[in-house]
């Protein structure tokens, strides 16, 4: 699984019935810009099951933090919402995304719209 780095879950917080967040260890070599997302996932039947998640923690933090909605029948989220401290999680080695300040054109107003967790990318 060279595409992924195995990290360890450090904390899990269930905010309410539909939202949760978790932090993981972070490979020292992982570099990303604020606004990037990473593929994260779990190994299921010997294969990675992964989806794109915005990184909530700033790029200078020692750990990674992610925020998610709970999807009862979601292929990954239904499993991810049940992780515990100490569990292993797969984190992609290649950050990507275009929600970067440097990509925005100067303007008087900035409107940020999103779906799902809403505030996670901001």
What are these regions (language model features)?
Residues 75-122:
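FNR/FR-type flavoprotein reductase catalytic core
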